[in-house]
Amino acid sequence: MDDNKRKSLDAALKSLDKTFGKGTILRLGDKEVEKIDSIPTGSVGLDLALGIGGVPKGRIIEIYGPESSGKTTLTLHIIAECQKKGGVCAFIDAEHALDVKYAKDLGVDTENLYISQPDFGEQALEIVETIARSGAIDLIVVDSVAALTPKAEIEGDMGDQHVGLQARLMSQALRELTGIVHKMNTTVIFINQIRMKIGMMGYGTPETTTGGNALKFYSSVRLDVRKTATLKQNDEPIGNRVKVKVAKNKVAPPFKQAEFDVMFGEGVSREGELIDYGVKLDIIDKSGAWFSYKASKLGQGRENAKAFLKENPAIADEITQAIQNSIGIDSMILGAKEDDEGDE
């Protein structure tokens, strides 16, 4: 660059710094690439699939899927993990359906969880924006986009047409919210539901999410949550097998998948993931229906092996450490306790 151009650029940069603050625009080579902070999801496999050890901080996240697929359970685990690291969380319960006892069973500190049950969509999104601007909240969960009903629709008569009203509401809110959450390093998770496209024929998926296309565009990460099987013991349902696909990822390579068990009343099964990864990495030996680790017989059948690990946390921690060493990821991803002990 010649001297005249450089002088003109320097003058423009100084003017921008004076008007908008220092660091408004920087040359990429002069700025170190920042490591993206993350919040663990409570699932080893999903943290790995996301590529950075969890959901990114300071970004908008969409978690969507059919009903009863495990979306809210996953977000409650993320809240619990955020609180373990000293984070402050808020839950915008637009569906008015939060089960406080279940949240507590999953490890959520409900005493210190901020909750709001808004009456209409505009109020919910205004609450999200206000608490995000405060800079004091680390994680905000909105459950769900489908329940963010515009005020005009609530106050209108049954049968009135309100075409595109919710989509416009989401688009306007997200335009403002994206910059705020990035600046304040606040993560906002929107839970969304699946709908079938009307009159869909030919190629392409017949499914879509509610609230228009704005959330798809502004989300840094989109997680597609699906139930693949019902887990049974003695013919009694005890949980679901869940598959999560990273449908969009702006912070790491997308399209990776993770599968894990979600047990009724307990949430994501850590022991189930230890068995899955242990067998995959030859840390746990599987011979027929029997699982064993070193000299210890874990049990016959997967559920018995999971029960053994739950009753023997020392062996579970040892397997966790072995998996960690084998994969070469830090303790944050596997939810080990070293980070917490180091902070004290």
UniProtKB/Swiss-Prot annotation:
GO cellular component: cytosol
GO molecular function: ATP binding; ATP hydrolysis activity; ATP-dependent DNA damage sensor activity; damaged DNA binding; single-stranded DNA binding
InterPro entries the UniProt entry points to: AAA+_ATPase (IPR003593), DNA_recomb/repair_RecA (IPR013765), DNA_recomb/repair_RecA_CS (IPR020584), P-loop_NTPase (IPR027417), RecA-like_C (IPR049261), RecA-like_N (IPR049428), RecA_ATP-bd (IPR020588), RecA_C_sf (IPR023400)
Keywords for the protein's UniProt record, in alphabetical order: ATP-binding, Cytoplasm, DNA damage, DNA recombination, DNA repair, DNA-binding, Nucleotide-binding, SOS response
SUPFAM superfamilies hit by this protein: P-loop containing nucleoside triphosphate hydrolases, RecA protein, C-terminal domain
Subcellular location: Cytoplasm
Effect of residue 105 to N: In strain: NCTC 12894
Main location: cytoplasm
Outcome of mutating residue 219 to A: In strain: NCTC 12894
Signal peptide as annotated in the record: none
Sequence positions that bind ATP: 65-72
Disulfide bonds: none
Highest rank taxon of the organism: Bacteria
GO biological process, one term: SOS response
Purpose: Can catalyze the hydrolysis of ATP in the presence of single-stranded DNA, the ATP-dependent uptake of single-stranded DNA by duplex DNA, and the ATP-dependent hybridization of homologous single-stranded DNAs. It interacts with LexA causing its activation and leading to its autocatalytic cleavage.
Family designation: Belongs to the RecA family.
Protein name (database record): Protein RecA
Source organism of this protein record: Campylobacter lari
Lineage start: Bacteria, Pseudomonadati, Campylobacterota, Epsilonproteobacteria, Campylobacterales
